[in-house]
Amino acid sequence: MQSIEDIWQETLQIVKKNMSKPSYDTWMKSTTAHSLEGNTFIISAPNNFVRDWLEKSYTQFIANILQEITGRLFDVRFIDGEQEENFEYTVIKPNPALDEDGVEIGKHMLNPRYVFDTFVIGSGNRFAHAASLAVAEAPAKAYNPLFIYGGVGLGKTHLMHAVGHYVQQHKDNAKVMYLSSEKFTNEFISSIRDNKTEEFRTKYRNVDVLLIDDIQFLAGKEGTQEEFFHTFNTLYDEQKQIIISSDRPPKEIPTLEDRLRSRFEWGLITDITPPDLETRIAILRKKAKADGLDIPNEVMLYIANQIDSNIRELEGALIRVVAYSSLVNKDITAGLAAEALKDIIPSSKSQVITISGIQEAVGEYFHVRLEDFKAKKRTKSIAFPRQIAMYLSRELTDASLPKIGDEFGGRDHTTVIHAHEKISQLLKTDQVLKNDLAEIEKNLRKAQNMF
């Protein structure tokens, strides 16, 4: 039995995973569950500005999450937190809506904002977008499975949801299931405990499209990997589409069974890298237009130059600037944006380490010219520092393996993997090398902070 306070806290945990920290802190952190009137879930916001923004931007999103948690369809209403209305909190019994085969219909699991029309295409995600669209148009015929990997907040989940929406819109009665690998694991464990493994298998092996997020969390879970292996085989054999996301390619997921890794590589593997400046500006423009905001170009350029880590933080920064403008009752300018973002920009910028910066730091330490990192020379005095630079590029940046290979003279991504594995092994026993890398990283971060 859950009170609405419990349900709201569970809702906030899901919201937090789908929003940047600045966005969450600005809009959601201070909200509370106020009351339940009939079928209306009432949420209290700290002021009328936040209330209006949430009402315009997040009503459906919150309703979807509430349905996923409770199995009930709620109307969602936001009120100003200053209102002094008191209602008795209601207890809700979860009762998930199932179709005739016992499979959750799945539409409520998809974020309505995550569709292809709202996805901003750039050089870092163009291939992943094209592959996702091809899969949506021809499930199980284009690429199966489709494996998308990349850093946090770069659009992997957006593309997965977009495929789900597209399939449901264009194929009657299509069963689409979206979930994280953590949820798959938790439900599997519960099914064993409650002696309901057959119901669990029916639920996940009778869908047309399975979208599973953050597959890397299956690492080390042998029982869950076994179950997912058979689920994968059943869906694949029945020509059902499987889309998987991860923060790294299959080869780099530790303690993942070889048979699963092999199956993940049957289809197409594509990565998403951080957006370049032009794409970041385009993302901000699209966000501003969608939310009906009039943001000067100089402000968008300023934000795009300061926030270059991922899309969630970029959009969160824009929201923070808008909220700050309203609260202090000042026009939105680049100066106001700098003031609004002063708490998050220093930590963000100080962490920006580039491959070229790593090459400079390693080259200076080992007396290797920058051009030698990209040359074909294999002498130990050059090859070993090059491997160290590749290792650090993998450890300290969000760049993909192909991107790192390109920065080192167009080398294949397998060369990067080999370099990373070699240095990783040496670091376990070689104290001198460990000290060298610590000194290089110290010099690198010092140079970044000076910049």
From Swiss-Prot:
List the source organism.
Answer: Listeria monocytogenes serotype 4b (strain CLIP80459)
Keyword Nuclease on entry? no
Q: Where in the cell is it found?
A: Cytoplasm
Q: List the PANTHER family hit by this protein, alphabetically.
A: CHROMOSOMAL REPLICATION INITIATOR PROTEIN DNAA
Q: What does this protein do?
A: Plays an essential role in the initiation and regulation of chromosomal replication. ATP-DnaA binds to the origin of replication (oriC) to initiate formation of the DNA replication initiation complex once per cell cycle. Binds the DnaA box (a 9 base pair repeat at the origin) and separates the double-stranded (ds)DNA. Forms a right-handed helical filament on oriC DNA; dsDNA binds to the exterior of the filament while single-stranded (ss)DNA is stabiized in the filament's interior.
Alphabetically, the GO molecular function entries are: ATP binding; ATP hydrolysis activity; DNA replication origin binding; lipid binding
Q: What is this protein called?
A: Chromosomal replication initiator protein DnaA
Q: Where does the signal peptide begin and end?
A: none
Which region ranges are annotated with the description Domain II?
A: 72-108
Cite the residue spans of the region called Domain IV, binds dsDNA.
326-451
Give the UniProt family note: Belongs to the DnaA family.
Instruction: Share the domain note from the entry.
Output: Domain I is involved in oligomerization and binding regulators, domain II is flexibile and of varying length in different bacteria, domain III forms the AAA+ region, while domain IV binds dsDNA.
Query: What's in the keyword line of the UniProt record?
Result: ATP-binding, Cytoplasm, DNA replication, DNA-binding, Lipid-binding, Nucleotide-binding
Q: Which Gene Ontology cellular component annotation is one that this UniProt entry carries?
A: plasma membrane
Which segments carry the region annotation Domain I, interacts with DnaA modulators?
A: 1-72
InterPro entries on file: AAA+_ATPase (IPR003593), Chromosome_initiator_DnaA (IPR001957), Chromosome_initiator_DnaA-like (IPR020591), Chromosome_initiator_DnaA_CS (IPR018312), DnaA_C (IPR013159), DnaA_dom (IPR013317), DnaA_N_dom (IPR024633), DnaA_N_sf (IPR038454)
Q: Which domain of life is it from?
A: Bacteria
> Which biological process terms from the Gene Ontology are attached to this UniProt entry?
DNA replication initiation; regulation of DNA replication
Region Domain III, AAA+ region: what ranges?
Answer: 109-325
- Binding locations of ATP: 153, 155-157
Q: Which NCBIfam families match?
A: DnaA (TIGR00362), PRK14086.1 (NF010686)
Instruction: Give the quaternary structure.
Output: Oligomerizes as a right-handed, spiral filament on DNA at oriC.
